[in-house]
């Protein structure tokens, strides 16, 4: 059963990358709806932090995901999903509205979770977020979470959701929210404004022989004790 679930989600993630690269979604000439580009209208502090730290992680050969700008041991990094970086080492990191672009180098890929870390120069137009060690069991049913990222061809979008359940696959937390291709790697914030996890996938169901994405069922991986220990060690 576990093998079947893993296979199912590998298919889901592959599908997400294909959608990211599809002309209909990634056409640079396509027009996006008007997006709030400042945090002046944001009421909650954790929503503001989510937006101010969010970055786009762009592959040198195309495709993109999302991530968050963080500071560890006096140095600067971007945390994202491991499947966003794949086996590549260098990525273009963009801030909101393409105000700033730098090159990020992958320095850590988790051996057990969908988490990766890139070293980056200091970004002038981004504010670093704080990582919070969080176990799956620490995420309470009904807890409100917020995350910001770059789905499809859109600029920065902020979403919120609530913890609705747990999944053994990848020790994930299931969030009733919203995500789409390109959202992978978005940092998930608790109400205290701390990064407690990352968006790694959305639901996938088979219906009449075809696979259908469930954009409102978001899979989140937490930054647990072992991950935090490894991240702190590699960031020294």
Where are these regions (language model features)?
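Bacterial N-terminal signal peptides that target proteins for export
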Residues: 1-12
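Bacterial N-terminal signal peptides
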Residues: 11-20
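Catalytic-histidine neighborhood of serine endopeptidases
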Residues: 23-30, 72-125, 141, 201-203
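C-terminal cap/linker of serine protease catalytic domains
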Residues: 26-47, 125-127, 195-236
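A conserved glycine-rich beta-strand in the N-terminal activation segment of trypsin-fold
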Residues: 41-43, 52-78, 101-103, 185
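Catalytic nucleophile loop of clan PA
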Residues: 68, 178-199
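Short, solvent-exposed secondary-structure boundary/capping segments
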Residues: 114-119, 171-177
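Flexible, gly/ser-rich surface segments that form the specificity/activation loops bordering the active-site cleft
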Residues: 127-173, 179-183, 199-211
């Amino acid at each position: 059963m576990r093998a079947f679930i893993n296979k199912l989600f590998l298919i889901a993630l592959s599908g997400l990358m294909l959608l990211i690269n599809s002309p209909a979604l990634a056409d640079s000439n396509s027009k996006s709806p008007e997006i709030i580009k400042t945090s002046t209208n944001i009421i909650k502090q954790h929503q503001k932090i989510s937006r101010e730290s969010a970055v786009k992680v762009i592959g040198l050969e195309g495709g993109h995901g999302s991530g968050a700008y963080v500071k560890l041991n006096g140095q600067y990094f971007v945390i994202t999903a491991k499947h966003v970086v794949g086996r590549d080492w260098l990525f273009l990191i963009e801030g909101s509205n393409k105000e700033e672009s730098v090159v990020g180098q992958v320095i850590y890929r988790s051996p057990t979770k969908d988490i990766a870390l890139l070293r980056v120069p200091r970004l002038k137009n981004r504010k670093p977020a704080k990582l919070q060690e969080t176990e799956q069991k620490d995420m309470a049913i009904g807890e409100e979470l917020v995350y910001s990222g770059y789905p499809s061809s859109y600029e920065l979008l902020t979403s919120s959701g609530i913890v609705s359940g747990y999944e053994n696959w990848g020790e994930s937390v299931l969030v009733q929210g919203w995500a789409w291709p390109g959202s992978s790697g978005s940092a998930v914030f608790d109400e205290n404004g701390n990064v407690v996890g990352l968006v790694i996938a959305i639901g996938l169901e088979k219906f009449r022989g075809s696979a259908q994405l469930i954009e409102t069922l978001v899979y989140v991986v937490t930054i647990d004790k072992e991950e935090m220990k490894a991240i702190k060690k590699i960031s020294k």
